[in-house]
Regions:
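Conserved strand-loop elements at the edges of beta-sheets that form or border functional pockets
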Residues: 2, 163, 287, 298
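Repeated scaffold domains used in trafficking and secretory/extracellular systems
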Residues: 293-295
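Acidic, Gly/Ser/Thr-rich repeat motifs that build Ca2+-stabilized beta-propeller blades
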Residues: 1-123, 170-185, 237-275, 299-320
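Beta-propeller domain segments
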Residues: 42-44, 119-283, 291, 301, ...
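Hydrophobic residues at beta-strand termini and immediately following loops
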Residues: 30, 89, 161, 285-286
Length: 324
């Protein structure tokens, strides 16, 4: 996450927060009191800098040995060496034993926090807005609840914005303020889709073209159904999409408003164009160069930064040689 064009904050699964100074290539640790637990696929997850605060998704445990995804915030002021007054705003319910599918990405839009919550390997829960499993949640910046979106469901939680997801690891805002997410299917069925209130992507009644890892059908066996919101793009076989971001900047002006997508499985960065809900120009930008790609971000100049998901993770920058 960029603080400015010279400074990036990086989260590490085990709980470390680092500030990278791109001007002098130094790394310093940020002190914090986030009650993070590294468990399974969980740990310190996403981070967003907004109006002198950091908004963070992380894994938290309870004294029964169960875990969940949580959202919190804290003050972050110059000289950027400490998070102060940290508070947890939301704990996804219920806590579960599973160490899988925590999500999670965070986005600030129209004065609200949006965060993706994975279904933790308990897909049947993602059809019920009375819990947070397999959903997008929406809360105010101070953690209070917003307008209920699933009021037609008994006991629905007011912060549940969208349901029926498996493991959403990307969340991005377009130039016209539409929100999009990336979601991991099982054996096939990864997708990009709109984030819309009171909608349901169908997991695990449908599998978006994928199957269970043992080869059996998912739910009804249908790839899609008119009962559920349909993705704008899906992949069979899976590409394992993680972070996504809409491109803006002068470095690659021809890519303006295109969506950049990282792929863990195929170790690539690709881009797509979206117009009126239709996808075109799916193009691979980078493949098999830096390993599994976990994160992508763009600075104000339009330079693209990537973080690899390897034992020795590295930061990479993509610039346009035609502009040098």
């Amino acid at each position: 996450e960029f603080i400015n064009d010279e400074m990036i904050i990086i989260t590490e699964k085990e709980g470390k927060l680092s500030l990278v100074n791109l001007r002098n290539n130094t790394v310093s640790e940020i002190n914090h009191s986030i009650p993070v637990t590294s468990y399974g696929q969980g740990g310190l997850l996403d981070i967003v800098h907004y109006n002198d605060y950091l908004y963070i998704s992380f894994t938290i445990g309870n004294n029964q040995g169960k875990y969940t995804t949580a959202i919190g915030k804290g003050e972050f002021l110059y000289p950027y060496n400490e998070i102060k007054k940290f508070q947890t705003l939301l704990e996804a319910l219920p806590y579960l034993n599973s160490g899988a599918h925590f999500g999670s990405r965070v986005l600030i839009n129209r004065g609200n926090i949006y965060a993706t919550i994975g279904e933790r390997g308990n897909g049947e829960l993602s059809q019920n807005p009375a819990n947070h499993i397999g959903s997008v949640v929406e809360i105010n910046l101070n953690g209070t609840k917003t307008t209920p979106r699933f009021s037609n469901y008994k006991d629905s939680l007011p912060e549940v914005f969208q349901i029926g997801l498996r493991n959403p690891q990307g969340l991005a805002l377009s130039i016209n303020e539409n929100m999009y997410l990336s979601n991991h299917g099982a054996k096939g069925g990864d997708f990009i889709g709109l984030v819309l209130p009171n909608t349901n992507y169908g997991w695990n009644n449908i599998g978006w073209g994928g199957k269970n890892y043992i080869g059996t059908q998912i739910g009804t066996g249908k790839a899609f159904s008119d009962e559920y919101l349909k993705p704008i793009l899906s992949w069979v076989p899976s590409i394992a999409p993680s972070d996504i971001v809409f491109y803006q900047g002068n470095e690659f002006p021809e890519w303006s408003n295109d969506l950049l997508i990282t792929s863990l499985k195929f170790k690539m960065l690709l881009k797509i164009s979206i117009s009126d809900g239709n996808v075109s120009n799916e193009t691979i930008i980078l493949k098999d160069k830096i390993g599994r790609i976990r994160d992508v971000d763009v600075n104000s100049k339009g330079e693209i930064f990537l973080i690899s998901d390897e034992s020795n993770s590295t930061i990479w920058k993509i610039t346009n040689p035609k502009r040098k």
